């Protein structure tokens, strides 16, 4: 059985069924995938030249981007952190707490590509279970190989977006038992 989901939704699903003793894995197409990320932006039309609104918006983004708040959001929604935390290792420590393993069968999972900053000599390779290296950890922090073959989607225009939306619906609702009329 396969299901198409964003990584955060995949993590949520994996956590939910794990309580029932069901194990799910997260997979990324070998050819390519879109690079997914969430972010906040300040719209010019919403802030305009209002310095107080701009300051409030910047304060909010700064607040939710503090490592301690990033961890709270990761815990609550299951999505990847928007920042690495810089010199603050709170986010990395949280990931190790959630997905780390000291079992003899654990495997190395390299997160240097995400966390290592210029001049940082810390080695962000953690021990995790084989299961997590293909499950929740992999969904939140895919391997560097996956990141290399990922691309940011662009805006296609109204007509193309309608076609893409139709393709997405067809894919999500695909039922191999139903034969499509070829006429």
Model-derived regions: residue spans:
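Solvent-exposed loop/turn segments at secondary-structure junctions
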Residues: 7-12, 31-34, 47-48, 68
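Ligand-binding pocket segment of bilobal, Venus flytrap-like solute-binding proteins
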Residues: 1-29
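Conserved C-terminal helix/tail region of periplasmic/extracytoplasmic solute-binding proteins
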Residues: 117-183
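Mature extracytoplasmic/periplasmic domains
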Residues: 43-141
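Structured segments of extracytoplasmic/periplasmic soluble domains
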Residues: 13-16, 63-70, 76, 167-174
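Periplasmic-binding protein-like
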Residues: 20-44
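Extracytoplasmic/secreted proteins, especially bacterial periplasmic and envelope-associated proteins
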Residues: 9-12, 41, 55-59, 68, ...
